[in-house]
A protein has these predicted regions:
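Von Willebrand factor
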Residues: 141-176
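A cross-taxon signal for low-complexity, glycine/charged-rich
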Residues: 194-198
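Short, surface-exposed recognition loops or helix-turn segments adjacent to catalytic cores
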Residues: 122-127, 132, 158-166, 181-182
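Von Willebrand factor type A / integrin I
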Residues: 1-32, 42, 170-174, 200-294
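DG-centered beta-turn motif at the end of beta-strands
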Residues: 57, 84-86, 122, 168, ...
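Short, electropositive alpha-helical surface patch
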Residues: 132-147, 267, 293-294
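Conserved phosphate-coordination/catalytic loops
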Residues: 100, 155-162, 256-259
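An amphipathic, basic-hydrophobic helix/alpha-beta surface used to engage anionic
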Residues: 1-136, 177, 187-188, 222
């Protein structure tokens, strides 16, 4: 992609997503996410009726009488976008590739963030963290994010959501709102070991931060068409195989693998209480995103 082509695509996404964030998501974003974060303010002596869960045991031990931690609502929110840049994003059989939809969704969220005078940052990840853009405010910062969303090429092609979430936990000491944007292909082992759908980094991140998952996938990720002999390449491992798609058992096995992944995701959502939405590249992502803001 030439510099001129990149600028044209950035401008196109800016026009589309900035308008969406300003006209559709601004109010919903503010009411749903603004003020969720709580920042430590001070300690004071315990008073009858205070929540005992707020007791600061270290100070209490030193002072020989109970003290509690006092928190105040954070007026400024930090939003982190965790964007999957693994090989499987470079796939699309419908109107556009998954990476294009991911870029538009991330841009819409980024513009919604700065419309509310909040900071937004990005973590690009494959099977490791590929790039970190620290959270900042301002339109120029969002345009920089969009350029990276469109042009960044990772060093690796696999997927490891744990690496991204561990990085988030270490990088963001204070509570933030985070969106995990991925197709989640390769995020879990297949077949899934019983009871292993939720990993420690997912649990820790979902407790520390306001974490939501946005799954973006292509129709053909879930179902294989009956088109006869087809050469298939795994975009994350590079392995190529021939598949006779006219055989029903082949198509069924493909669909079963997809269902196994979805079951793992559902287990993760259920055990962590994580907000989530799933969308195909040929669906209206605006309607899907609105589900996260309600």
């Amino acid at each position: 992609m030439t510099s001129e082509e990149l600028l044209q695509r950035v401008r196109k996404i800016e026009i589309k997503t900035h308008g969406l964030s300003r006209n559709i998501f601004a109010g919903e974003y503010h009411s749903q996410f603004k003020g969720r974060g709580m920042a430590f303010s001070e300690v004071r002596e315990y008073q009858p009726g205070d929540d005992v869960r707020s007791i600061d045991w270290n100070v209490t031990a030193r002072m020989n009488r109970p003290y509690i931690k006092v928190y105040e609502e954070e007026r400024e929110l930090t939003v982190m976008l965790l964007v999957d840049v693994s090989g499987s994003r470079n796939f699309g059989t419908q109107s556009q590739m998954k990476r294009d939809t991911m870029a538009e969704v991330a841009a819409t969220l980024a513009f919604s963030t700065i419309e509310n005078n909040d900071k937004v940052g990005v973590i690009f990840f494959s099977d490791q963290v590929e790039k970190f853009i620290p959270p900042k405010k301002g339109k120029s910062h969002v345009l920089h994010i969009i350029r990276e969303l469109l042009s960044f090429e990772p060093a690796h092609t696999g997927t490891n959501i744990n690496a991204a979430l561990e990085y988030l936990t270490n990088a963001q000491k204070r509570r933030c709102t985070a969106f995990l944007i991925s197709d989640f292909i390769g995020a879990f082992p297949q077949p899934l070991p019983k009871g292993k759908g939720v990993t420690d980094p997912v649990t820790i991140s979902s407790r520390k931060h306001d974490l939501s998952a946005i799954q973006i996938y292509d129709r053909r990720d879930a179902e294989m068409p009956d088109v006869g002999l087809l050469k298939v390449r795994d975009p994350e491992t590079g392995v190529r195989v021939w598949a006779d798609t006219s055989i029903k058992s082949v198509r069924d096995a493909y669909a079963k693998a997809w269902r196994g992944q979805q079951e793992a995701l559902e287990e993760m959502y259920n055990k962590t209480g994580m907000n989530h939405v799933s969308m195909r590249t040929d669906e209206d992502y605006v309607k899907k995103l609105m589900q996260l803001f309600k």
